Design a protein with these regions (language model features):
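Well-ordered alpha-helical segments embedded in enzymatic catalytic cores
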Residues: 108-111, 179-183, 211
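Alpha-helix C-cap/termination motif
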Residues: 115-119, 190, 218
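Short acidic, glycine/serine/threonine-rich loops at helix termini
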Residues: 107-108, 135-140, 208-209, 236-238
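Preference for solvent-exposed, low-hydrophobicity sequence contexts
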Residues: 1-93, 97, 111, 141, ...
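Nucleotide-state-sensitive switch-loop elements of NTP-binding domains
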Residues: 76-98, 120, 124-195, 203
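Glycine-rich phosphate-binding P-loop
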Residues: 93-118
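Phosphate/Mg2+-binding loops and adjacent switch elements
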Residues: 186-187, 193-243
Length: 369
């Protein structure tokens, strides 16, 4: 990584596109409400943009990786309406952040979570986008408890990870909603006073609108934050139980990502969760099995799709039924009723779920069932 020094004036913003690292050498800066500690190095993930806002003049050392970038802009990169909405939230809030792709949903969720953490001591975070999950592998949704502000929600550790079986809610709406329902049940059991739900980005068309209405019926947010997006039936539902709806603008400096880049991000994530994996032979008679999609055939027929170069993305759980790990089913022996699964999961396997993504052991998506 090349290293450069930057001076940022009070009230301005240093925009960093990862992969990069940032170290504040003097002054005070924050990212989405998280104050950065001096002389600590913060790692920025690839294909993500991080706004380091100058609360005072600050100097920083920046290291940039391949394809990364850094630039200083005048003023605050996030709108005044964002900070105003976040600052008006009270203890006991359940916040749902809604918007299309590349509108800043996760950035807003980070700002809200950090604001609630600083004021009230913590919040639960739900990442409900199975295509761009930052708490868990692609094709899953997850929840984490945040005890202190963070510059990147991916730093939080998920206490619940549940499989959806596909990388978009549009590919299997019922499987997605069932997973969200289960996730909310686990989150409510924690007794978290504040909840922030970062929704998926499918918002256009009648089916998307219906899904979002059903989604908020499950979450029951006290506050709906809608970024450059208005779905009347969702607004009416939230207001129907006394919820507050805030419409905010999409910031002008959001990083836009193509479908190819999103696919690359998923591939890197699969690889990370399959790191140090090995092949495990699992007798199917020893585990509970589930096919996540009602539109897919039962497992004996489904597993016939497994090929040497295209395994089936599989989800495994042990004693904790709320924490699933991913694997790739690489072989099915019908006669012996065993499967070979490439996975990093350690310990006994009690449950296996099958989705619809065909995946190589290197983490490349090669098709969908």
């Amino acid at each position: 990584m090349s290293s450069t020094s930057h001076r940022v004036g009070e009230g301005d913003t240093l925009l960093l596109d990862g992969p990069a690292s940032l170290r504040i050498t003097s002054g005070r800066a924050s990212i989405l409400g998280c104050t950065l500690k001096p002389n600590k190095s913060y790692l920025m993930r690839p294909h993500r943009r991080y706004p380091a806002y100058a609360e005072t003049d600050f100097h920083a050392e920046v290291r940039l990786g391949e394809g990364a970038g850094a630039k200083i802009i005048k003023g605050d990169s996030i709108g005044e309406d964002w900070r105003d909405v976040a600052n008006r939230l009270q203890n006991g809030s359940t916040v749902a952040v809604m918007g299309g792709s590349d509108t800043g949903k996760t950035a807003f969720a980070t700002l809200v979570a950090n604001t609630l953490c600083k004021r009230y001591g913590g919040t639960a975070i739900l990442c409900l986008d199975p295509g761009q999950s930052y708490l868990s592998p692609p094709s899953t949704i997850a929840a984490a408890l945040l005890r202190e502000p963070t510059y990147d929600l991916a730093q939080a550790k998920a206490f619940t990870t549940l499989p959806v079986g596909s990388t978009s809610a549009s590919q299997d709406e019922e499987a997605y909603l069932r997973a969200v329902q289960r996730l909310m049940e686990h989150v409510r059991k924690t007794g978290a006073a504040n909840i922030v739900a970062d929704l998926d980005g499918w918002v256009e068309g009648g089916e998307a609108e219906t899904l979002k209405e059903r989604l908020v019926q499950i979450i029951k947010p006290s506050h709906l934050i809608s970024i450059d997006c208005t779905i009347e039936r969702v607004v009416e539902a939230v207001m129907g139980w006394g919820g507050v709806v805030n419409l905010v603008k999409r910031p002008s400096h959001i990083l836009e990502r193509s479908s190819g880049v999103r696919r690359e991000i998923r591939s890197m994530s699969y690889s990370r969760y399959l790191k140090n994996a090995s092949v495990r032979t699992i007798p199917l008679g020893w585990v509970d099995m589930e096919v996540l999609s009602e539109s897919l055939p039962e497992y004996p027929t489904l597993l016939n799709n497994v090929k040497p170069d295209a395994g089936l993305l599989t989800y495994l759980a042990g004693e904790d039924e709320a924490q699933y790990h991913i694997g790739v089913t690489t072989k099915y022996d019908r006669g012996r009723r065993v499967v070979k699964i490439y996975t990093a999961m350690a310990g006994p396997v009690k449950r296996i779920a099958f989705g619809r993504v065909l995946l190589t052991v290197e983490g490349d998506e090669v098709g969908y069932l």
